Every structure is written in C-alpha cells, then in structure tokens.
Amino acid sequence: MVPPRRHRGAGRPGVLSSSPPFRLRSAKFSGIALEDLRRALKTRLQMVCVFVMNRMNSQNSGFTQRRRMALGIVILLLVDVIWVASSELTSYVFTQYNKPFFSTFAKTSMFVLYLLGFIIWKPWRQQCTRGLRGKHAAFFADAEGYFAACTTDTTMNSSLSEPLYVPVKFHDLPSEKPESTNIDTEKTPKKSRVRFSNIMEIRQLPSSHALEAKLSRMSYPVKEQESILKTVGKLTATQVAKISFFFCFVWFLANLSYQEALSDTQVAIVNILSSTSGLFTLILAAVFPSNSGDRFTLSKLLAVILSIGGVVLVNLAGSEKPAGRDTVGSIWSLAGAMLYAVYIVMIKRKVDREDKLDIPMFFGFVGLFNLLLLWPGFFLLHYTGFEDFEFPNKVVLMCIIINGLIGTVLSEFLWLWGCFLTSSLIGTLALSLTIPLSIIADMCMQKVQFSWLFFAGAIPVFFSFFIVTLLCHYNNWDPVMVGIRRIFAFICRKHRIQRVPEDSEQCESLISMHSVSQEDGAS
C-alpha cells in the first residue's frame, strides 16, 4: 500500500501548507466578530452616558422652569391682591370725593410715567436721535448692543442653552463594508484615517439673539434688511403712537365705566360683571377673527349662556343699596366689560404678534394723549351738571396718587411680567381670582351681607369664564358638539339594528335550508 504523498514543506516549521488555510480564515472571522462585539459594547456604553447626561441636563432645566413658574404664580397672585385693594381704595375715595371722571383722568394720565423710558432706555432714545438710520433704527440699536456685549466667548456661552448630547452614527465607515470572500487575496494594510467622536454636543442660541446673528450673516442691501425688519422687527415709536392715539379713547371710556360702577355698587358685583369681558371678547372675536383660536363653537356659546344666567342671578341678589343704584352700577360694569373687549379684539387685529408692540411705550403714549386731549371733559361735565369740578383735599389726592401708581402703573407691569414667566393662559385665569377675593374683602371691610342668589350667580360666572379660557386654548376642541354627534350616532345605530317583529307569511327564504343541509350531508 502506497502511503499518501506528502506536500512540500508540510511538516516544516514556519512554512505554510499549500492546502486551504481553514485555520487562518476562522481566525480572521473570529477577529471580525470580536471587533463587532467591541464596537457594539462601546456604542451601548455611549448611549448610556448620553442618557445620563441628558437626564441631568433635563432635571436642571426642569428645575429652572419650575422656579420660573412658581415666581410667575406668586407675582400674579400679588397682582390680584393689588387690584382688589385698589378697588376697595377707590370705593373709599368715592365716599369722600365722588368724582369718577377726575379719578379716571388722574390714573390714566399716570401712564405717562412710562415715557421716562426715552430718558432711561437707550434704544427708545436712539429712535429719536438717529433719524438717518431709517424708521427701524431701534432694531439696529438692539443688534449693536447685542454684538457689543457678546465680544467674549464667556458671554456667548452663558447665553446658550444647556448642552444636549446626541450619538452620531457614521454609515460610511470602512469597517461596515462587507468583507471580501476571496481566499487568495492578500491582507492589505489599513489606511490611516481621522477618528471623530461618536457623541455630538448641541447648544441652542436664544431666540432673542438668533435674529441679530442672522442679520450679521446677511449682506447690506437695504431691500433685504427692510424685508427682514418688516417681518420680525418691532413697531417704531411713530407707529406705536398712532395705535395709542386710536385706543386712548376706548381705554379711557372703559376705565371711566369701571369707576362709575364702583361709585354705584359693591366691589364684588363690579368685579363679577367686569369679568364678563372675556365672554364679550369671544363674541367680538368670532365676528372679527384674528387667528384660528377665535372660531365660534357650540361649547363657547353654552358657556356664554351660562355666564348670562349667572349675571342675572347676581343682579337679582339683594344688597344694602337701593335697587336703582345697583342697576345703574351693573349697566356701567357691563359697558366697561364690552369696551374692554373691543379694546382687546381691535388691538389683536391691529398688531399680529405681541412681540411687535412695546407695551410700556404703548401705555406711555396712552397716558400722554389722555393728558393732552381729554382735559376739556372737565368743562363739559361741569357746565352740564353731571360732575362738578372740585379739587380734592390732600388726603383724597394722596389716595388717588397712591392708587394710580400702585393699582395702575405698577400692577400692569407686574401682570405682564407674570405672563412672561408663566403663560398668557395662566395670566388670564388669574384675573378671575379677584372675584372671591373681592367678596371676602366686602364681607370683612364693609360688612356687606349677600344672599344665596349672589353666590349662586357668582359660581356660574367664574366657571363659565374658566371654560371659555380653556376652550380658547384648545381652539379645535368642541366637546358639546362631539357629545351631540356621539349621542345622535348611538340613537341612529340603535334604530338601525333593531328588528321589527314580522309574521311568518312575510318571511320567505330564497334558498331552502333543508336542501342545503342534505347537500352538506351527502358531501
């Protein structure tokens, strides 16, 4: 028997056999598997690290947001207390000096203090001194102030948001390409390549700085600058003055109606009837809509009807004053609520976005036009006999000044600050808290006794205001219409599946069941 022929170099050390290298190929495949396993473990570890870092950052940002929310709620509650105290102080002033027109004129004229911003605030002052910069000079001044402040990296980094770490996956790595299956191909040396980090850090620029950063990357043609400024820039001082001139009379009449109502009836009744301004706003916004949230729905209509029923119960409630004076005070309160609704709806149609209008400048011009244009009303009311002009004494004058500075100038600023810290919805809901606070104040200070009709009417007014605010927030939600549709569908479905008893003569089978059963048995 001839032994098998031995290949050359088969038993020598250091010499590879010419037979298929199964051992080398298995080692190569095991190395690839170990590399894939190592890459998978590294990716999983990076994902865990990313999750931990993002979790820590979200907790820090959430804590900051909770602090802002808590501060905003405290400020709004403080505003409610100021407004109730202002109403009580106004009622006290009217017992000594019953001049609603003088009180309204003095308080509204104190808005002119906001115009001191042209002396204190540099962008306002530059709108008047830099006429060559164009009608949007204030915007360029804000941009220059931003670029001057952001000259260091520390200032820029402090304005950025918290870092967010996101894993990066490179799809074009050579290791992810399929390996060659050719056995005879020699192993090629690895090429040197740049290795990037598998984690990407993301920071967001604040919205207040994003616009200036965009302008810095744009060219200088006037048309491009003008188009971007018309889109996102604030209104100029001239435009704000024109809007203030139009709304000066509406604002004054609304506040005059409120002061007249306070001179005729209790503070609680005035505040409850004045809270219906949100419902009048709903009706006017449906007629003159400014956005999709002004859509009229059946749920909002039922809330308005509920509020009207509460207003009727409030007017039927007895009080210490004569019924005629309470009726006049209720009419003044409703008139003030309607005028305030007209003011809100029209200013929303005039200004498409709230950030375009400088609120302190707006109120400052309202006070200025009120001071310059409405002073002839003293002569008109004096000679017609509606309100005799008489200068108040020192005590009453001091009360009017304090009430105007705190209850008008300061409270408006605090309310806007609270809305910025929380939201406009929470700020609107906070206005309704003046109703129970005013009731408690009337019971404690003036010893006013209200019947059960008053509380039975106050609850629907407060509840309907809350419902309308909630429905305006969810502008596409109409639960009443959805419920009616479901009930109608349920009733129609029950009628459709219900069968009427029939006689045996009226029923006829097209296929004989006996024949069908026989065919099934034969098969």
UniProtKB/Swiss-Prot annotation:
Keyword ATP-binding belongs to the record: no
Compartment(s): Membrane
Keyword flag DNA repair: no
Cystine crosslinks: none
Domain EamA span(s) in chain numbering: 252-316
Membrane topology: Multi-pass membrane protein
Superkingdom of the source species: Eukaryota
GO cellular component terms, A-Z: membrane
Residue positions, PTM Phosphoserine: S207
Residues in the signal sequence: none
Assigned keywords, A-Z: Membrane, Phosphoprotein, Transmembrane, Transmembrane helix, Transport
Family label: Belongs to the SLC35F solute transporter family.
Function of the molecule: Putative solute transporter.
Protein name per the record: Solute carrier family 35 member F5
Gene from which the chain derives: SLC35F5
